[in-house]
């Protein structure tokens, strides 16, 4: 399964909860970066043991994906498109044949029933690599869009802000719906490049201004209100967070 969408649409949250619900374990994770190598996806070696005894089963260091194959669990690959394209293709045999060859030992790991992979990928971000057609065909792709309506987005932001405030034990009053609606409206207008009433065009910034960023802005404002204010969220508490979310590139977004 490939969860595709812009940053901040809840792909990681969905993948984590799906893995936990299906196999009772969401920790078999490959966190992708531009420096991710095939060893991270397939397997590596304990080099001290490898030098002393050569390639043995004891010297082999399984990747999270190999562990998931052996245990019949779900492996997660975060930010798949950040992995270089030639390394991504190491997944093709694993996904199509459910098989991971280990030629150094003259054997292969056959996936146990229950094994699967849930990957997430951004389709609008810097530093991403296109997926090959062969790899795309081996995934069932689900696109996670931004909320369709302002009301839906306000509801999502309100719920997540309340959850995070409880988790962080912030001694601040939860923001009124009007404050959250103001942040959501700003984000939606900038994403669309048009004011809510359709009368004026506005410049869209280079960032995605996702729902996740709206949650972060409101939560950051609550923390400022709790520790440096009177415990009530004020527009001034949101201002710094809004500036940081909107102006990602000082030149392009000026």
Predicted regions located by residue number:
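A diffuse structural propensity rather than consistent per-protein peaks
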Residues: 37, 61, 210, 232-239
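Residues that form generic nucleotide/phosphate-binding pockets
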Residues: 44, 138, 156, 160, ...
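AAA+ P-loop NTPase catalytic core and its hallmark functional loops
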Residues: 1-168
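Conserved AAA+ ATPase small/helical "lid" subdomain
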Residues: 154, 161-232
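C-terminal engagement/docking regions of AAA+ P-loop ATPases
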Residues: 226-254
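Short acidic/histidine-centered micro-motifs embedded in hydrophobic/aromatic stretches
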Residues: 9, 94, 186, 238-241
